[in-house]
């Protein structure tokens, strides 16, 4: 199952990040650029670093100047995340370019790469909820509540595995077709963000 392969790469990325747990640590992607897993690993690494950016910026004692700098790093990370999704969709467009789409084929509400994006974020939720469910210094009540949440996340993972694999099978069989829209991020574009383009005057 393609979804489980992707998830195993996401888990590896998360595990590798937490060896040092530092948002500034360099990535050491174990896959070559020719492998699809390289994109998956990089995608999740970006997600994992951003997850920890979001933790840091919520510190009530954060220095305002540091918070502004971090907010800009988060914006840049969001753009990277979107770019990676588009790279992954490009892979699938190429992979299924030979498929003869059936006349009655339908379009899906999201592309394969955005489904994998959700799976990547879900892997992070599961990792951190599992940490909380097993945190020794936490109260039993806290651990029990986190275990209940973890069980729901694991059920969601099973459902998402099925949904992703069904989608890929449908595309491969011509029952569904891919249509990818380049994400029109506006806040980083000085031609589209009013604050930025007014500032240029």
Residue ranges and their predicted role:
Residues 1-201:
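Anionic, Ser/Thr-rich low-complexity intrinsically disordered regions
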């Amino acid at each position: 199952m393609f979804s489980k392969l992707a998830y195993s790469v996401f888990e590896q990325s998360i595990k590798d990040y937490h060896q040092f747990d530092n948002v500034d640590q360099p990535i050491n992607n174990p896959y070559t650029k020719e492998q699809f897993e390289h994109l998956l690993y990089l995608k999740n690494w970006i997600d994992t670093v951003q997850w920890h950016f979001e933790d840091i910026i919520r510190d009530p004692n954060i220095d305002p100047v540091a918070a502004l700098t971090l907010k800009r790093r988060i914006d840049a990370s969001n753009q990277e995340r979107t770019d990676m999704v588009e790279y992954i969709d490009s892979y699938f467009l190429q992979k299924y370019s030979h498929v003869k789409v059936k006349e009655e084929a339908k379009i899906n509400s999201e592309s394969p790469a955005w489904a994998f994006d959700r799976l990547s974020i879900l892997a992070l939720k599961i990792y951190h909820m599992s940490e909380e469910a097993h945190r020794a210094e936490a109260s039993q009540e806290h651990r029990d509540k986190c275990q209940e949440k973890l069980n729901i996340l694991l059920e969601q993972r099973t459902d998402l595995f099925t949904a992703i694999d069904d989608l890929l099978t449908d595309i491969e069989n011509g029952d569904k077709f891919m249509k990818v829209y380049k994400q029109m991020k506006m806040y980083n574009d000085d031609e589209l963000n009013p604050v930025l383009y007014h500032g240029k005057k």
